[in-house]
Curated annotation (Swiss-Prot):
Keyword field: ATP-binding, Coenzyme A biosynthesis, Cytoplasm, Magnesium, Nucleotide-binding, Nucleotidyltransferase, Transferase
Gene: coaD
NCBIfam families hit by this protein: coaD_prev_kdtB, cyt_tran_rel
Species name: Clostridium botulinum (strain 657 / Type Ba4)
Record's function text: Reversibly transfers an adenylyl group from ATP to 4'-phosphopantetheine, yielding dephospho-CoA (dPCoA) and pyrophosphate.
Protein name: Phosphopantetheine adenylyltransferase
Residues at the site labelled Transition state stabilizer: 17
Catalytic activity: (R)-4'-phosphopantetheine + ATP + H(+) = 3'-dephospho-CoA + diphosphate
Chain residues that bind substrate: 9, 41, 73, 87
């Protein structure tokens, strides 16, 4: 496997995402973490902020690149000459959604394959949405996101509570 693409919004990146990145980077020559630009969806962090945070937490993984994209994932894949999409799965409901997306991507380009990776069980409950919700209500996010981005989240949420 040469180049694989791990797409998502990563708003913000979680320890579950990072688990998939670390594992996926071991089975390909190059892993592109592709941050989706979705103008219809207002995120907590801008695309540039998300890209910067992911670069920070993956800096020790020499074969991981972080880029943003808009439009069809298939077009981005062609531009990057990649034929493999990496998708992390937490639950059966994730599988149902991602399976449909994989079929659509394969319909658009039969040369594209989707590889599903199960998230480590200790992160199976974790989502970016739940991280934002916990942070907004003053909960501790230390076990949910990489340490390097906790200050970014606190600053965005404007919350001063310290995790102990």
């Amino acid at each position: 496997m040469k180049t694989a693409v791990y797409p998502g919004s990563f708003d913000p990146i979680t320890k579950g995402h990072l688990n998939i990145i670390k594992r996926a980077s071991k089975v390909c020559d190059k892993l592109i973490v592709a941050v989706l630009v979705n103008p219809e969806k207002k995120g907590l962090f801008s695309v540039d902020e998300r890209v910067e945070m992911i670069k920070r937490v993956t800096k020790n993984h020499s074969n991981v690149e972080v880029q943003c994209f808009s439009g069809l994932l298939i077009d981005f894949m062609k531009e990057k000459k990649s034929k493999v999409i990496i998708k992390g799965l937490r639950t059966m409901s994730d599988f149902e959604y991602e399976f449909k997306m994989a079929l659509m991507n394969n319909k658009l380009d039969p040369n594209i394959e989707t590889v599903f990776m199960m998230t480590n069980a200790k992160y199976s409950y974790l989502s970016s949405s739940s991280v934002k919700q916990v942070a907004m209500f003053g909960g501790c996010i230390k076990d949910l996101v990489p340490d390097e981005i906790i200050p970014d989240i606190k600053k965005k949420i404007n919350h001063k509570k310290e995790c102990i």
